[in-house]
Amino acid sequence: MTGALAICDQCMAEPERPWRKAYTLMVYRDYARHTIHRFKFGNAPELARPFGQLMAEKIIKNQLNADFIVPVPLDFMRQFSRGYNQSMLLAEAVSKLTGIPGCQPLRRIKRRSKQSGRNRADRHKELAGNFILKSPAAVKDRNILLIDDIFTTGATLHAAAVTLLSGGAASVTVFTLARTPGHALLF
C-alpha cells in the first residue's frame, strides 16, 4: 500500500477519458486488497472513516479543488443486499473532513451484472448509458470530484463522468481509494 497520491499514466494517456485527472490512494493488492474487500463485502462500513481520512488528507495536501463531491451510485438491489454504498460512505467521510459539500445527482438506471472478471471492452459496453442525472442544475458549471472505491478499467467512472459532463458540469476529477495493479503510477 502506498500513501502517495498517484495518477495512473495509462489513464492519463487515453484520449477518450472524460475526466480532467484521475487520482488513486493505493494499489489494490496484498493488505490493501484484503481490507478493501472486507469494506465492500464483509459488512465493515466503519472502514469508510479511516479510508476517508486518508483520502481527505491527500485532497487537502494536493489542493484538489472541487465544488461538490459525488459518489458513484450502486444499483438498488446491490445496495440493498450489501446494506450500504461504500462509495457513498467514502464521499461522506471525505466531505466532512475537507469541507467540500457532497451531493448525489446521479442515479443508476440499469441493473448490471458484476464487473469483476470482465474485460475492458465488455465493461464499457455494459455501463454505457447506465446513469442519469437527477438534478442537472446541481452540477451546471460545477467542478466535480467523483469518488469511487476501486478503479479497474474505468468503465463505471467513464459512464458517470460522461453523464455529469453531459448535464453541464464544468469538469470531473476522479479519486478512488485503490487502483488495480499493473498500471504505472505517477507520484
Question: Can you annotate each of these PLM segments?
Answer:
Residues 1-97, 116-117:
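Extended interfacial segments that mediate partner engagement and assembly in macromolecular machines
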Residues 92, 101-187:
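PRPP/pyrophosphate-binding module of the type I phosphoribosyltransferase fold
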